[in-house]
């Protein structure tokens, strides 16, 4: 009887020790978050993204014809949904409807963000679509942060410009700001995308966390389908909100 009790004791202690070791390992693993932008225009192609692990999040364009559908599908799977908000770029090009601009009043920005929240149900955060002119404007981004605070949304800075004012603008508000470290698909070349994916993994390993942004393009989807199943054991996929309290550093640098 004593032997049996001792054996159960050993088994229990061993299980507890293994559990503790797994918790420590998970805490030390590099955290990688992947967000797929520009969702809401091509449900057939975008459905391939919804076949990936549910830690992969989607950023939905608020005025896209299938915005509500794709946000709802993603949320029903337990995915994190962001609003992919059009913001004014530095380059001179035609602007999409309801593109946020530095010259807009607080009321106008509030109206646009309110509509976006209505069009993209279940959103818990927002990131910028283009936006180098808007995100580099401190007054403009302060208006954005005031609006986001009222909806309790975080802001993922896509870092389309190195002089982004998003973090400064959020000071004094309840809005958390996180930063993109890697763009996966600046090109449609699979080798380039694979290289960028590996870079994101290495940054997550070195810095403790990293956020990569990609798009629902065939080459990107193909590379992710190939590489996600063989993600290194010391890297864990997480949703962006899991990184809200992680050090953000300087982001991923300027991309035109």
What are these regions (language model features)?
Residues 2-18, 25-256:
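Catalytic-site microenvironment of enzymes
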């Amino acid at each position: 009887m004593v032997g049996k009790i001792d054996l159960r004791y050993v088994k229990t202690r061993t299980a507890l020790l293994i559990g503790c070791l797994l918790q420590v390992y998970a805490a030390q693993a590099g955290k990688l978050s992947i967000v797929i932008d520009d969702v809401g225009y091509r449900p057939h192609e975008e459905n391939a993204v919804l076949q990936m692990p549910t830690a992969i999040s989607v950023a939905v364009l608020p005025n896209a014809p299938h915005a509500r559908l794709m946000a709802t599908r993603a949320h029903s799977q337990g995915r994190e949904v962001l609003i992919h908000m059009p913001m004014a770029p530095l380059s001179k090009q035609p602007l999409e409807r309801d593109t946020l601009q530095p010259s807009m009043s607080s009321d106008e920005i509030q109206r646009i963000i309110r509509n976006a929240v209505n069009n993209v149900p279940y959103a818990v955060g927002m990131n910028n679509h283009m936006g180098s002119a808007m995100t580099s404007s401190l007054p403009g981004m302060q208006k954005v942060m005031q609006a986001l605070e009222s909806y309790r949304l975080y802001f993922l800075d896509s870092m389309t410009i190195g002089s982004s004012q998003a973090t400064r603008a959020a000071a004094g508000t309840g809005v958390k700001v996180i930063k993109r470290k890697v763009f996966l698909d600046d090109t449609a070349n699979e080798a380039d995308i694979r290289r960028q994916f590996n870079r994101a993994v290495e940054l997550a390993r070195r810095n403790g966390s990293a956020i990569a942004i990609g798009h629902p393009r065939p080459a990107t989807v193909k590379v992710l389908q190939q590489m996600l199943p063989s993600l290194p054991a010391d890297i864990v996929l997480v949703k962006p909100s899991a990184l809200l309290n992680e050090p953000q550093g300087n982001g991923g640098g300027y991309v035109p």
